[in-house]
Amino acid sequence: MKFGWIKTTGNDLEERMESVKDALESSIPGIIAEKEEISSVRELGNIKIVSDNLDADVVLINKGEDLEILKSAKLSGKETGVYVVINTKEDEVYATDVSKLDFVDYVVLEGSDWTIIPLENIIADLFSEEIKIVSVVTNVKDAEAAYEILEKGVDGVVLIPKDINEVKDFSKLIERMNSESVKLDYATVTKIEPVGSGDRVCIDTCSMMEMGEGMLIGSYSRGMFLVHSETVENPYVATRPFRVNAGPVHAYILCPENKTKYLSDLKAGDKVLVVNKNGETREAIIGRVKIEKRPLFLVEAEYNGENLRTILQNAETIRLVGEDGKPVSVVDLKVGTKVLIKPDENARHFGMAIKETIIEK
């Protein structure tokens, strides 16, 4: 996972604390601050503080300072890092060497001209090391380039922002860099029938979804259906753009890092994966899960000779995504309708994808 920090900027403490507020409001996870600012930062909110003080969450020293400080910090349970300004080849060698010490978690690299920082050399030298490489930049364009160097890129970026808009753009960049892409394809509906009542799960998230977005749900791990969010206007009920009426308690849902969970296991605070019709994803936090007894529909579809099934609530507001990329209500499904699914050859063990023969029916 890529991460980002903000470095406090401003002529006085009040201005520098505005940087902290911007970071908090934009969900930036960390801030590099001066040691005299630590208490003020903590008063503003819960954010990882990186500073040259043992009161920080990450103890960060400059090149040339005593590494014994980091040893002590590590023993006290802190994360540690070294800040290196790259001006010469000797600086590059130092950064590589210090990164291989087992008590150093981060190496933070800054150069007077970012474009000539030998990040490629350092990334290549440290490819198999546990160290997290962090680059200091002054704009979002350079941040994106740093994340993508040698495909692997740096693990994190420190942005020295000009204004709140740049912080917001940085936050969006981090979200995009961490978004997973899933391969979707079309399956052909072969059967739709009511099956009686059961306990179905509504997932209410802390995010507003858009047309074409939903979640991947299914009775089988080998094929999950894109169940559309409640973003479609309806004369009978108001839209609920934060909600996916997902299906019964037994069904799988695709979560971040290609893991699955049972719908019955979800709870407030969990993260789920919002997926659009193009397979682009983003994370959403669950605010509430509602389990209620409702009438249910069985939906069967065929994909490459495989029979896939899912069960959904029997209601006109429950939708899959059709061949034209538009939502189609379950009450309008017909034999031959094509709907988006995520095919998967892997079985699942405690939500993890594994290579194993498994029969689901």
UniProtKB/Swiss-Prot annotation:
Knockout or disruption consequences: Cells lacking this gene do not require either aromatic amino acids (AroAAs) or p-aminobenzoic acid (PABA) for growth, and growth is similar to that of the wild-type strain in minimal medium with acetate only. One possible explanation for this unexpected phenotype is that a second, presently unidentified ORF complements the function of aroB' in M.maripaludis.
A GO molecular function held by the record: dehydroquinate synthase activity
Record-level GO BP terms: amino acid biosynthetic process; aromatic amino acid family biosynthetic process
InterPro entries: DHQ_synth
Highest taxon in the source lineage: Archaea
EC primary class: oxidoreductase
Entry keyword annotation includes Transmembrane helix: no
EC number: 1.4.1.24
Keywords, comma-separated and alphabetical: Amino-acid biosynthesis, Aromatic amino acid biosynthesis, NAD, Oxidoreductase
Reaction equation(s) it catalyzes: 2-amino-2,3,7-trideoxy-D-lyxo-hept-6-ulosonate + NAD(+) + H2O = 3-dehydroquinate + NH4(+) + NADH + H(+)
Function per UniProt: Catalyzes the oxidative deamination and cyclization of 2-amino-3,7-dideoxy-D-threo-hept-6-ulosonic acid (ADH) to yield 3-dehydroquinate (DHQ), which is fed into the canonical shikimic pathway of aromatic amino acid biosynthesis.
Family: Belongs to the archaeal-type DHQ synthase family.
Designated name of the protein: 3-dehydroquinate synthase
Organism the protein comes from: Methanococcus maripaludis (strain DSM 14266 / JCM 13030 / NBRC 101832 / S2 / LL)
